[in-house]
Amino acid sequence: MNPELQSAIGQGAALKHAETVDKSAPQIENVTVKKVDRSSFLEEVAKPHELKHAETVDKSGPAIPEDVHVKKVDRGAFLSEIEKAAKQ
């Protein structure tokens, strides 16, 4: 390695001072956060409630028309056919 380069690396670089802007403080002045008593709320949630029946439309099934038939593929025969073609 070049001796000039080694000495430049050894001396290091002169860095300029960086000014930082701390924005971690709250943006709204004169605001206090109050402690909320959640015990009454939690008691209300724990009580049994009467719920209304909800009508749902289940569209999670496959959207294949009834006149379309999907047949099962014999995977073993299919793979052996590919294997035979690869050996040729």
From Swiss-Prot:
Keyword Acetylation: yes
Modified residues (N6,N6,N6-trimethyllysine): 35, 72
Modified residues (N-acetylmethionine): 1
Region: Disordered, residue numbers: 1-22
Listed GO MF terms: actin monomer binding
Top-level taxonomic group: Eukaryota
Signal peptide (from-to): none
Keywords annotated in UniProt: Acetylation, Actin-binding, Methylation
Disulfide bridge partners, by residue number: none
One Pfam family hit: WH2
Domain spans labelled WH2: 37-54
Subunit details: Monomer.
Function: Is able to bind two actin monomers at high concentrations of G-actin.
Name of the protein described by the UniProt record: Actobindin
Biological source species: Acanthamoeba castellanii (Amoeba)
